[in-house]
Regions:
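Substrate-binding pocket helix/loop in short-chain dehydrogenase/reductase
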Residues: 92-93, 100-105, 199, 203
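Short C-terminal tail/terminal secondary-structure segment
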Residues: 1, 223, 234-247
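Short, small/polar-rich loop/turn modules that mediate ligand/substrate recognition or access, typified
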Residues: 82, 170, 175, 233-235
Length: 247
């Protein structure tokens, strides 16, 4: 399903990005690992058959252009993009500076928009491709115990952006979708513990399945949205959250 397909994964040096890169490599794709930490990228790339690594700060316009140009130069095409790089600025809105708010939106929303545009220009000349944006359940609902106005705004924005780009780019054969993860065991959620069955009660109480996400569950969803099995799916936001968005 993914054999030989060239797919950029941003934020690939850790967490979900690393998991997706590993899954893509296992599916026969050519994952292009992009992140700022070159040492971690190189170490991961060495473990993954067919993988490539390009150090990149996605908030830097020149780095974004270099990333796409290097992929085309090395591989001749681009089949997929996973906009995964992101961060939060947890804290009450009244204590958050506008600079902190802007930084989160720059990384979580502006950078995916700009990189998607560059990717789309490359894809439309080769018959299309697939873009998967990593949103969040917090873009669909608020969680009072985790105040983060910047993160919530950015993830709600990426959901709207996903639908708009899907509408605009379908004519080029480019599908744009998103995953909206709940709380999954990863480096980003390390403070919650490494056992998704034993996450804090305030999260489990909001999750009909009464657990966090297990390793593999989220990257399986991303691979589905990138692949031929979702060839008639675009503009969709796939919640992978144990039902949290509906409670």
């Amino acid at each position: 399903m993914h054999e030989g397909r060239v797919v950029i994964v941003t934020g690939a040096s850790s967490g979900l990005g690393e998991q997706v890169a590993v899954a893509l490599s296992g599916a026969g794709a050519v994952p292009v690992l992009a992140a700022r930490r070159a040492d971690r990228l190189d170490a991961l790339c060495a473990e993954l058959p067919g993988a490539d690594a390009i150090a990149c700060d996605v908030t830097d316009a020149a780095d974004r252009e270099r990333l796409i140009a290097t992929v085309i130069e090395r591989h001749g095409r681009l089949d997929g993009l996973v906009n995964n790089a992101g961060a939060g600025a947890t804290g009450p809105a009244l204590q958050m500076t506008t600079e902190a708010f802007a930084h989160v939106l720059d990384l979580n929303l502006t950078a995916p928009f700009a990189l998607s545009c560059l990717a789309a220009r490359a894809m439309r000349g080769t018959g299309g491709g697939a873009i998967v944006n990593v949103a969040s359940v917090m873009g669909l609902r608020s969680i009072g115990e985790i105040p983060d106005a910047a993160y919530v705004a950015s993830k709600a924005g990426i959901i709207g952006l996903t639908r708009e780009l899907a509408s605009q780019w379908g004519r080029y054969g480019i599908r744009v979708t998103a995953v909206a993860p709940g709380f999954c065991a990863s480096e980003m959620t390390a403070e919650l513990g490494d056992d998704p069955e034993a996450f804090p009660e305030f999260l489990l109480a909001r999750t009909p399945l009464r657990r966090g996400g297990r390793p593999g569950e989220l990257d399986d969803a991303v691979l589905f949205l990138l692949g031929a099995g979702s060839s008639f799916v675009t503009g969709h936001v796939l919640s992978v959250d144990g039902g949290m968005a509906v409670r």
